[in-house]
């Protein structure tokens, strides 16, 4: 219930559509779990995402092709200021097609930055501090990815390379 309320409250701020791509805010937990199942990645299976949404540290949003708005494409983990922590498609991958969407994502970040309130900016500052603390802990613990295409890589290195900070 709390997550559904948060999703409703952020929808006007984060949803965005142009001819080719759209950012879609899920309605709640069921949409997020369906997305994780459809793309066979971890977003619907880990409590940490629910906790981050409830604390408004980060949100789960969907990158979609506008012509196929209901078809899962990429799942995004996004901080309150539009900083994108993760961009993942099937099996936690990033395919070459993501490069085509990068300009759209940068444009979306600019649009979001114009919609932010002071409260959003404060949440974003806290979110960044928590992210940096998590990265440091992952480095210290030398956490490795165990499955999939990224098996053997340090998780922190993958997360850092995935990060798309907003210019705002």
Question: How should each PLM-predicted stretch be described?
Answer:
Residues 1-168:
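Catalytic-core elements of nucleic-acid end-processing and repair enzymes
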């Amino acid at each position: 219930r709390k997550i559904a309320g948060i999703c409703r409250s952020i929808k006007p701020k984060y949803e965005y559509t142009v001819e080719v791509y759209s950012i879609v805010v899920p309605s709640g937990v069921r949409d997020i779990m369906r997305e994780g199942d459809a793309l066979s990645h971890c977003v619907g299976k880990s409590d940490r995402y629910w906790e981050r949404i409830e604390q408004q540290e980060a949100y789960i949003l969907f990158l979609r092709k506008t012509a196929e708005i209901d078809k899962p494409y990429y799942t995004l983990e996004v901080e309150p200021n539009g900083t994108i922590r993760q961009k993942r498609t099937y099996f936690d991958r990033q395919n070459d097609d993501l490069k085509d969407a990068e300009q759209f994502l940068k444009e979306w970040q600019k649009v979001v930055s114009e919609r932010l309130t002071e409260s959003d900016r404060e949440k974003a500052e806290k979110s960044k501090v928590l992210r940096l603390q998590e990265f440091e802990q992952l480095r210290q613990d030398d956490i490795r990815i165990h499955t999939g295409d990224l098996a053997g890589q340090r998780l922190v290195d993958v997360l850092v390379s995935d990060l798309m900070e907003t210019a705002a």
